[in-house]
Amino acid sequence: MPFAFIEQMKSVIHFDALGLSPIAFDLGVWHLFGLTLHPLIHWYALAYITGILLAWRYVLFLLKQPGTPMKPEQTDDLVFWSTLGILVGGRLAYVLFYQPAILENPLEIFKLWEGGMSYHGGMIGVFLAIWWVKTTNHLSWLRIADYIGCAAPIGLFLGRLANFVNGELWGRPSTMPWAVIFPQAGALPRHPSQLYEAGLEGILLFAFLNYQFFATKARLHPGKLAGFFLVGYGLSRFIVEWFREPDVQLGTLSWGLTMGQTLTIPMVIAGLWLIITSKKREISL
């Protein structure tokens, strides 16, 4: 057994050997007005910014297709409020569901540069943003949600890649040849669950949703694409959670599921409801 373990250790990937760093750019030390500053730009921040910008551009591309639910210039408000929804919703949900101890020192909530965001909370924030834009511009929020859903996997993909670069949110111990030894996770090789999520929530979900958008009449059934997104993300996250190491402070909950899996259940239910009822909302171009 010891010899087998040694041979396996030789075949796995050592994260440190990949030469990855969470810091994208080191801007050096600055001395301004008596203050010493050392600004660093992290890949995680760039992933969020790039994901939002690319999703914005992709929504504008989708809006060029027949039957657009809003004018291109109205996307400016949508992007602003969606970005705010991602930051506020993502951070608050992380604190409430994963790190409630932060509430003992509320100022810690604002330290976004230290990480700690919930994808579920970010989605809720985006849906609230869509509702606000819909209300102020008298639009169909379900149709807007359909278009946002088709673009959202872009941000999910980049975010999961950033998780991998950061060497965080690693998977459970694994004997697979592509297992990775993360320096902060001990000596055991682990599933690169961040990349599993990038593939499922990012690449596959993007391909499926946009096939539905261009090759079927799904966009003529308001809420159907948004429903596909919710179900697709929920199932992807639920599956990958079996390979992902549970959060240390939570572990596996009393009913045998992780917090991530538990939070996907209402998401999948809501998505199924949107899909099933979408036929009643059919529109014509």
UniProtKB/Swiss-Prot annotation:
* Enzyme Commission identifier(s): 2.5.1.145
| Superkingdom of the source species | Bacteria
Name a single GO cellular component.
Answer: plasma membrane
Identify which top EC class this enzyme belongs to: transferase
Regions crossing the membrane:
17-37, 43-63, 78-98, 113-133, 139-159, 195-215, 223-243, 256-276
Report the membrane topology from the UniProt record. Answer: Multi-pass membrane protein
An example of a GO molecular function for this protein is: phosphatidylglycerol-prolipoprotein diacylglyceryl transferase activity
Q: Where is a 1,2-diacyl-sn-glycero-3-phospho-(1'-sn-glycerol) bound in this sequence?
A: 160
Please tell me whether the keyword Membrane is annotated for this protein.
yes
Q: Which PROSITE patterns match?
A: LGT (PS01311)
Q: Which Gene Ontology terms describe the biological processes this protein takes part in? A: lipoprotein biosynthetic process
Question: Which Pfam families does the record cross-reference, listed alphabetically?
Answer: LGT (PF01790)
**UniProt pathway:** Protein modification; lipoprotein biosynthesis (diacylglyceryl transfer)
Keywords (alphabetical) are: Cell inner membrane, Cell membrane, Membrane, Transferase, Transmembrane, Transmembrane helix
UniProt-annotated location(s): Cell inner membrane
Q: Of which family is this protein a member?
A: Belongs to the Lgt family.
Q: Any idea what job this protein has?
A: Catalyzes the transfer of the diacylglyceryl group from phosphatidylglycerol to the sulfhydryl group of the N-terminal cysteine of a prolipoprotein, the first step in the formation of mature lipoproteins.
Q: What is this protein called?
A: Phosphatidylglycerol--prolipoprotein diacylglyceryl transferase
State the organism of origin. Answer: Zymomonas mobilis subsp. mobilis (strain ATCC 31821 / ZM4 / CP4)
* Name of the gene this protein is made from: lgt
